[in-house]
Amino acid sequence: MKKILTSVFAFILAISLTACSTVNKNAEKKELKKVDFVLDWAINTNHTGLYVAKEKGYFAEEGIDLDIKPAPEDSTSDLIINNKAPFGIYYQDSMANKLSKGAGITAVAAIIEHNTSGIISLKKNNIKEPKDLQGKKYGTWNDPVELAMVKSLFQKQGGDANKLNLAPNTDTNSVTPLENGLFDAAWIYYAWDGKLAESMKLDINYFYLKDFNKDLDYYSPVIIANNDYLKENKEEAKKVLKAIKKGYVYAIEHPEEAAEILIKNAPELKDKKDFVVESQKYLSKQYATNKDHWGEFDANRWNAFYRWVNENKITKQPLADNTGFSNDYIK
């Protein structure tokens, strides 16, 4: 009888402990703070660290439930400026005009340490440097800062701005219209469109903007946050960025595994696995020279670009040094 009672007691205790464990786990889940994060474009390897951090539970460790939102039809920055979401992905160059108009946003982490963007063309067009764009069709997004940079590099080498022909570039990637002859050259980010061109076995030429003007080694892309949110939720913002940093550090250390996680969260990339892995291998080396300092801004480089913007009178109001970025939330 004693053995029976002991067994019954043990059974009841086990059930109670299981129930308590379930309640505790549910309580833990309920305690997670939901935070929205808006992407800038279709899911790509710029975003890998976010999905790694979510998959690996890094956000949950910080008490955060990050809800990654797809890119809007309009600018991601407008959603952040208007406090529709606290975080998003944007670019230092595109921030210039927003900041000059008093937009309440701050870049809080650099996804990639150096500017990997540049001009791609088919090798047959013989475009190896900015001056070679003369007489060619350049596919443009028609962004004022973009055009100012291209024209500046072109003219610096003696090019005639009147002989730079512009064509609209509205495709989701620049490689397909380039291959089809809609334009002769386009501005791309090498990790995605450059690697896409390689996967398509296209013979291309490519040059980095920063190689022709060091002031154009700006930060792109960056994580931006709403200023009011940062003031009211400083510790929460730090937790979000701590988890994101862990995600990108993992991607630096394990590019192939990180690519698998990205593909898992973006099934549309499944049939492009080899391309995605190659893109990730390239980008994992670009995220940061020193993984311990991922996300941190170099004030000199940030300011050098906005001084260039000021000198070229691209914005209505000049941008003061140290405008628009902070390392306070990533360190």
Describe each region flagged by the PLM.
Residues D93-S94, N173-A266:
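Pocket-lining segment of extracytoplasmic ligand-binding domains
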Residues K54-E55, A60, L99, Q155, ...:
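Short polybasic/polar patches that bind polyanions
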Residues N26-T170, V175-N180, D184-A191, F207, ...:
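Short, glycine-/small- and polar/acidic-enriched structural segments
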Residues E62, A107, A259-I261, Q317-L319:
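Short, hydrophobic secondary-structure boundary micro-motifs
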Residues A161-N165, E268-S279, T315-T323:
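Short, surface-exposed acidic
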Residues M1-K34, I330-K331:
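Short, low-complexity disordered leader/linker segments with a strong preference
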Residues W302-K331:
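Conserved C-terminal helix/tail region of periplasmic/extracytoplasmic solute-binding proteins
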Residues K231-N312:
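Secondary-structure end/capping motifs
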